[in-house]
Amino acid sequence: MGTSEDKMPFKTTKPTSSAQEVPPTPYPDWQNSMQAYYGGGGTPNPFFPSPVGSPSPHPYMWGAQHHMMPPYGTPVPYPAMYPPGAVYAHPSMPMPPNSGPTNKEPAKDQASGKKSKGNSKKKAEGGDKALSGSGNDGASHSDESVTAGSSDENDENANQQEQGSIRKPSFGQMLADASSQSTTGEIQGSVPMKPVAPGTNLNIGMDLWSSQAGVPVKDERELKRQKRKQSNRESARRSRLRKQAECEQLQQRVESLSNENQSLRDELQRLSSECDKLKSENNSIQDELQRVLGAEAVANLEQNAAGSKDGEGTN
């Protein structure tokens, strides 16, 4: 038994590190420079190398802006920092179902089960061969090493095939996932959305003041404009009515004057006709006097009539 135990080969186990070694910082003089920047008593923000994600922003980046007065502007929120390597989904596009971890767990369980079975079989074979005689020690050890190597290779091949099948899903599975996602309409997975910061505007406070005081000013100007238009319309209407009244008065005066002129013409025509009649009568009377009294008597009468007219004019 002693010789068989001494001749049995044993596998050297690799020492496993309990904790992952943290790589050194890329800037060894970081602490001194940050103390000089922040002051002797200040402690800088934690900084980790690229393999380790940090939820806090880098110390050399500015934080949120200080609060300012509302009339001059509002503080713009600084967007949150996310760990590197994350996938940000578009708001209008759904994300595929995150079925990777669920499928990997059964594969790991199967691989661990197979490895445990292979180890138990190897331990049983090793015990049986140790109990057998020392004559078959060399052959048993060689067979055991061959079987152990083949079992390890088979396990590794099986694990690689399972991982390949998990990493490369079939076309049917992809169609099924797409159809289930389109029917349910729910986005699976906890991928954070990138927040959209509001657009900066330098006239925020001015807009607040102008929006509050601009409405009354606009209303007052509009009222003044309406009143001015109304007064202009009323003055134009009054002037139009006054001119219309003057035109009507002038028209009436023209009509009255034209009627009076026509009446005067008619009177003149009547008087002229009467004058003609009187002249004709006078001529007829003179002719009859000359025929009765003679021409000398008629001449004396004319002289007497002219002298009487002159005396009346002098008196």
Curated annotation (Swiss-Prot):
- State whether keyword Plastid applies: no
Gene3D superfamilies from the UniProt entry: 1.20.5.170
Task: Enumerate composition-biased segments (Pro residues).
Answer: 46-56
The UniProt PTM text for this protein says: Phosphorylated by CK2.
Q: Which keywords accompany this UniProt record? A: Disulfide bond, DNA-binding, Nucleus, Phosphoprotein, Transcription, Transcription regulation
Give, from the UniProt record, the effect of changing C275L. Answer: Slightly increases DNA binding activity
Q: Where in the cell is it found?
A: Nucleus
Task: Specify where the region named Basic motif lies, as residue ranges.
Answer: 224-243
| One Gene Ontology term, aspect cellular component | nucleus
Return the annotated region ranges for Disordered. Answer: 1-56, 93-268
Q: What SUPFAM superfamilies does the record point to?
A: Leucine zipper domain (SSF57959)
What segments bear the compositional bias annotation Polar residues?
A: 133-164, 178-187, 249-262
Assembly behavior: Monomer and heterodimers with BZIP16 and BZIP68. Interacts with GIP1.
Recorded hits in PANTHER family, A to Z, give: G-BOX-BINDING FACTOR 1, G-BOX-BINDING FACTOR 3-RELATED
Q: What is this protein called?
A: G-box-binding factor 1
Lineage, highest ranks first: Eukaryota, Viridiplantae, Streptophyta, Embryophyta, Tracheophyta
